[in-house]
Amino acid sequence: MYKAISFDKETKLLRKFVKLEFEMYKDDSDWVPPLIGDTISMLKGKNNPLFDNGPHMCFLVLKGEQVVARVLAGVDNELNKAKGIKQGYFSMFECSDDAQACKVLMDAACKWLNDIGMDSVIGPISPCNGDDRKGFLVWGQGMPVLLNAYTKDYYPRLILEYGFTKNENHRAYSMKPPQAAIERHIKVSEYARKKYGYSVDRLNVRKIVDESKDIKEILDHSVPDNWDYLNTPSLEAVIQEFKTLKQFYNGYYTFIARKKGKPIGFMVALPDYNQVLKRMNGRLLPIG
């Protein structure tokens, strides 16, 4: 007997929601456990700009007394307004290899979205409007790097059999360029910088608001209008993203290019902290 339950910020149920992932992947040596406390805080809305943009709901499916599936559903009102759509989203999908459990779960989530006026659903997206947990892994092997999705190989089958269709493919690449190539690119970049008169500076974390304004300006001019699922983040969201990333780095790997003081490009690189998170088993400290 399957039963779906919905909830918002109940800590006990949120812990069950988060811990299901640990049960699902406990025998998978490549899985990287998320930090339990941070994940629960994010699901309560702390430092989560997506939850500020509209309603959301968590769903669990029980088979008897056992939790066998979960999903987060919600609405990004800012995105819908910008695109002129009525679209809901789902995120953090986890499910046993059981088509009926998937059906009960997604029926509950889709009905809730329909009841609040949505006529379409997309996912899985990031639960905090970031780049983590997007999509399902359909090809690849080994431990994922930071921010890359890692999911069960049968998830695409479950979600397609339920009735969703594939929207697009995302790819992640790995490379280790030879030293000669690095040196050549350095020379080319120095030449281009002098010829075209632009500067490249590291992010100044002491001026994070001003730096975020420049990054916001770049994003406003570079995000394509035809990406239905993506809207330019607000200034507050950009600032919050950098505040969140501060736990991983100090700004050393972020650069902003400017020409005559006007921002024209930026890039963010992160160390692969999954190498560390893997050994922490979801906890910053051994006792909690």
What name fits each language-model region?
Residues 1-30:
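Generic start-of-chain signal for non-secretory N-termini
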Residues 2, 149-229:
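Acyltransferase donor/substrate-recognition loop-hinge adjacent to the catalytic core
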Residues 74-78, 93-95, 126-128, 178, ...:
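An acidic- and aromatic-residue-enriched active-site/binding cleft used to recognize and process polar
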